[in-house]
Amino acid sequence: MDKEREKQVYLARLAEQAERYDEMVEAMKTVAKMDVELTVEERNLVSVGYKNVIGARRASWRILSSIEQKEESKGHDQNVKRIKTYQQRVEDELTKYALTLSVIDEHVVPSSTSGESTVFYYKMKGDYYRYLAEFKSGDDRKEAADQSLKAYEAATATASADLAPTHPIRLGLALNFSVFYYEILNSPERACHLAKQAFDEAIAELDSLSEESYKDSTLIMQLLRDNFTLWTSDLEEGGEHSKGDERQGEN
């Protein structure tokens, strides 16, 4: 392995252990720009870094949004204004990180030779544009949703051709794509169809499931089934959140 690449991967590992995820992302972006095919470990370092920097800010945004609603109900207009300003800072950070995902299109995907890696990266891109669509509005929301849809569709095309229905990455993709249809495109019927199809196809090939991915695959299958049940029984009320990637573990 090239010495600079080895150094950056080591720094990313250090940053992960020190929980300095912003620096972890920067180190792995440097590796990605070398236009080399990433190893499974490197791929996971990219994913963990982004998941943490974006996940933390996403959680912050939701907390601020909840506080804003409470202050609004009490008529505390000045506090609402302060919260909105603070929330905008978090949104700007989220946007900045999601947009650095261009490194996936420009460097990582072109260097990938396996279907598994291609699905992994497009799924990741779809996830993060979905996160942007959660808090954007107007044309910005539409743009984020369009980018997310394209990435999920590209991932699905490759997954259908190259990965078994029981593969945890293919199942994780179906889980998150169905959540996208339900929560971003407000299309519960499409979400239900996608979740049920992925679950049924995996069940049909359960006997061929490898021992190493059994736990991950069956967990995601359970989440697919839970969402399908939730969405079909609660379409009228629509008050519950879907079980998406936060609970599916690494895949």
UniProtKB/Swiss-Prot annotation:
SMART domains: 14_3_3. Most abundant in roots and flowers. GO terms for biological process: protein localization; signal transduction. It holds the Pfam family 14-3-3. GO terms for cellular component: cytoplasm. Belongs to the 14-3-3 family. PANTHER family: 14-3-3 PROTEIN. This is 14-3-3-like protein.
